Amino acid sequence: MNNEVLAYINERLDEAHNYISSIFWVDGVLDYQYSNSDHDFIDHLNSMNPTHTKIVLIHSHGGADGWWIWGSSFLQFKDGSKLYDNEVNRWLNYDGYFIFAGACDSATYDDLGNTFLNKGFDAYFGYTDSVYTVNNARFYSAFFDKGRHLDVTISEARDHAEQQVLSEFGSNSDVVKNKIIGDSSLCLATSDW
C-alpha cells in the first residue's frame, strides 16, 4: 500500500473518530489495527466506563471459516490471533451499544454479531464478503458522518455511505455486501436521551 493510499485511509479514520466523538453522550472506541491480539481488543472494551453508551469501530482483517451455514466469522489482529464468538462470550463482560466491524467477512455468518448482541450490544454491522480497504475507509467515514445526527438510523447511515462510496469511486459493489445484525432502526444519536 503506497503512502498516498495510507494517508487517505488514516484521514477517513480521523474523520470517523471526530464524528463519533461529536456525539457527546457516547464513549467511542476506534481500533485501526491497534490491538495486538484478540484479547487486547476485548480488554480495551472491558476497560471502558460501563455506565456510558459505547460505539465501537474496528478496522482490521477478518474472515470466515466453515462451509455453507456451518461456519464462523472472525476478526484478525496483528499477532495473527482471531476473535471468534466463543472468545467474545468468554472474555467480554459488559454491555455496549453498537459495533461496526469493518473487516472482510465479519458478518458472513451471524455468530460473531449475535454474540456481541448477547453481551448487550444493540446492533452489529459487518460485511458478508471481501471489502477493499479504501472503500471501507470511505464507507465508515460517511456512515458516522450521517449517523452522528439526531434520529438517523444506522440503516439510513448505511444507505448514505453506500452512495458516497459509489459517488467517489464509481463502484460500491464490495461495501453493499453488508449486514446489520440486531436493531437496524438503532440511532447512534437519539433526541430522547
Curated annotation (Swiss-Prot):
Stored Pfam families: Peptidase_C25
Gene3D superfamilies documented for this protein: 3.40.50.1460
Listed GO biological process terms: proteolysis
One GO MF term attached to the UniProt entry: cysteine-type peptidase activity
UniProt name for this protein: Uncharacterized protein AF_1758
